[in-house]
A protein has these predicted regions:
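A general structural signal for well-ordered alpha-helical segments in protein cores
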Residues: 2-3, 25, 58, 119, ...
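Conserved anion/nucleotide-ligand pocket segment
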Residues: 33-53, 190
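Short beta-strand
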Residues: 38-41, 79-80, 215-216
Length: 242
């Protein structure tokens, strides 16, 4: 759905292919450059993304997704690997207007040195060190506003948080994903800096009065680290006493 909006409204994103079965997906690998990115097209708690450095890794990813590792998979996405740095850009919407809601960067790989499998996030900091006024304007004008135009075209009067997952390549933003919620662990670094009562913001969204709310922030940096069970994001023990 997101990629369809990107195509129609010319939102910058990685080139991609969508596949409904293993055979077609594996056939596509023959013409793929590596590394490549393979994504499960369903909810996977942030763990359904594979960065594959060769065809064998890509085949394993395709098999795991279509074999139901993240639930029933009707299709998957194979897309171009963008060599940049990820950033999370948050906005909040009342169906008429929107306001920016700070930025963050999370660290998705399970091991030190950006190694290992992707997770839901092993830690985050806010604001993103990448953000600047020029980049912020590009994100709003090239990605956020066209997306809202696209949603309106589908008859959606969107209200709530929009989490825009971006890859920043030489100060240019490319859309990786959207979530219609705040990110975690990103929210743990963003919300402590919020000075405005969040209930006031939510009420304004419900009543389409967001334009009348002044969202204020403390001028501080914030950082969080995730503690997880041994073995995560694969098989791991739950309900361990800390």
């Amino acid at each position: 759905f997101t990629k369809q909006i990107c195509e129609k409204y010319k939102i910058p994103t990685a080139s991609f292919g969508i596949f409904e079965n293993k055979k077609d997906a594996k056939k596509f690998l023959k013409s793929t450059n590596y590394p490549t990115v393979i994504k499960a097209d369903n909810l996977a708690s942030g763990k359904g993304v594979y960065i594959c450095t060769n065809e064998n890794e890509a085949i394993i990813a395709i098999d795991e997704i279509f074999n139901g590792k993240f639930g029933e998979a009707k299709n998957l996405l194979i897309e171009e690997f963008l060599n940049g740095e990820e950033m999370s850009f948050f906005t909040i919407h009342d169906g008429i207007t929107f306001k920016t809601f700070d930025t963050a960067q999370d660290h998705k790989r399970v091991l030190e040195g950006d190694r290992g499998k992707n997770t839901g996030g092993m830690g985050a900091y806010s604001p993103s060190r990448l953000i600047n006024e020029d980049l912020k304007n590009k994100i709003i004008n090239k990605i956020i506003k066209p997306t809202l135009e696209g949603l309106a075209g589908f008859g959606s009067k969107y209200k709530g948080f929009l989490y825009t997952g971006l890859m920043i390549v030489k100060n240019e933003p490319y859309l990786i994903e959207y979530n219609v919620r705040m990110g975690d662990p990103e929210c743990q670094t963003i919300l402590p800096k919020l000075k405005t009562d969040i209930n006031e913001i939510f009420l304004a969204c419900c009543e389409e009065e967001l334009n009348n709310v002044n969202i204020e922030w403390t001028d501080k940096k914030s950082l969080c680290i995730v503690v997880c069970s041994k073995g995560y994001p694969e098989e791991f023990k739950k309900n361990i006493e800390i």
